[in-house]
């Protein structure tokens, strides 16, 4: 239909605003459109968005909130294949079949093994006209972390750091330095709200005394899970990140031998066997709890560990408009120059926040990870 792209495009526009807001499920937007048999006089009569904790599903919300007219036809537009399995409620396919919807259009087959293709099959078997694959690439870019989680069994990883013009992250080692201006800092809170989890090393907590939440008005309830790599389990418990651990989910990765030190129950602990952190293990553990998009915020050792590995998918660099000098702490090791690694990363965006600049790099890929 001529208007399919229009409605799917509108759905994707809304979808972008809800990335990171529906953990542990991916966000979905559904639009219910009423029309006659020739698709004239078409209009949106209901819509649904995945609930904050992943339920209810968008399709169910759009259907349950509307009283159907038997003299009209209805098309349901969804950004992802309707689910076919029961969870905390009926499946979306069963809700569709109970309604007066005769046609369903969606962007992508759900990569979850419980769904993939089953929703499509059930709808077709019951006489529903189904069309999928519209604006597939645009939808995939939003759902990329979800596909990583379901297919690669790890989150999509974005490494984010702030540097001076000469590539320093602080004026000296073990010293906190404010690199960016207030506008850049506000944008960081938006970025955090779009991720399921944010990861830092123990030294970042020790030196910066960071909180790692989304503290802009309207985003307070969408803070990511805080993940700390603390091998020795030796962080002072008076740090800010521990004071609000009951309110904001906090996970600490530490050596197994430290279990006797662990008495505080406000945070979760994942034990590791080896002294050296294994990034593959960490990412797999985070994927198991539903993390699709992971933001890595520091510090220098963590940055370089991810950049040296095969697990860095995107890089965000905020650059303050000043120089620090040779005494400063380098963000990257000498063999980790991103601009020289042009075979691996593309510069995809360049934004400006007053005098600050934000560069966004993305790993080159041959194809979309759709299966």
PLM-predicted stretches and their roles:
Residues 1-55:
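Flexible, acidic/Gly-rich N-terminal and inter-domain linker regions that tether
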Residues 112, 116, 132-135, 150-154, ...:
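Short capping loops/turns at secondary-structure boundaries
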């Amino acid at each position: 239909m001529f208007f399919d792209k229009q409605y799917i495009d509108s759905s994707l526009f809304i979808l972008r605003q809800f990335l990171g807001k529906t953990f542990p499920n991916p966000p979905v937007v559904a639009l219910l459109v009423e029309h006659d048999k020739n698709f004239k006089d078409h209009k949106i009569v209901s819509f649904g968005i995945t609930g904050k904790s992943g339920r209810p599903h968008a399709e169910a919300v759009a259907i349950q909130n509307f009283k159907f007219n038997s003299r009209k036809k209805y098309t349901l537009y969804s950004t992802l294949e309707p689910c076919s399995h029961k969870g905390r409620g009926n499946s979306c396919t069963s809700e569709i079949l109970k309604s007066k919807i005769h046609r369903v259009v969606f962007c992508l087959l759900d990569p979850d093994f419980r769904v993939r293709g089953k929703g499509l099959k059930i709808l077709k078997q019951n006489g529903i006209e189904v069309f999928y694959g519209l604006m597939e690439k645009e939808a995939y870019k939003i759902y990329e972390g979800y596909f990583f989680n379901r297919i690669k069994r790890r989150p999509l990883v974005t490494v984010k750091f702030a540097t001076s013009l000469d590539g320093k992250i602080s004026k000296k080692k073990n010293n906190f330095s404010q690199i960016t201006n207030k506008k850049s800092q506000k944008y960081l809170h938006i970025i955090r709200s779009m991720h399921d989890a944010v990861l830092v090393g123990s030294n970042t907590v020790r030196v910066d005394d960071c909180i790692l939440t989304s503290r802009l008005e309207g985003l307070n309830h969408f803070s990511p899970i805080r993940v700390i790599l603390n091998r020795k389990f030796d962080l002072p418990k008076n740090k800010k990140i521990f004071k609000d651990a009951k309110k904001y989910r906090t996970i600490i990765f530490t050596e197994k031998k430290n279990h006797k030190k662990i008495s505080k129950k406000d945070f979760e602990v994942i034990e590791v066997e080896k002294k050296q952190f294994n990034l593959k293990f960490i990412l797999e553990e985070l994927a198991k709890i539903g993390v699709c998009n992971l933001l890595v915020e520091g510090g220098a050792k963590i940055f370089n560990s991810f950049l040296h590995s095969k697990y860095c998918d995107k890089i965000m660099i905020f650059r303050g408009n000043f120089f620090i000098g040779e005494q400063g702490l380098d963000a990257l090791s000498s063999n980790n120059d991103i601009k020289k690694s042009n075979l691996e990363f593309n510069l995809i965006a360049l934004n400006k926040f007053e005098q600050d600049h934000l560069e966004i790099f993305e790993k080159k890929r041959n194809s979309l990870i759709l299966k």
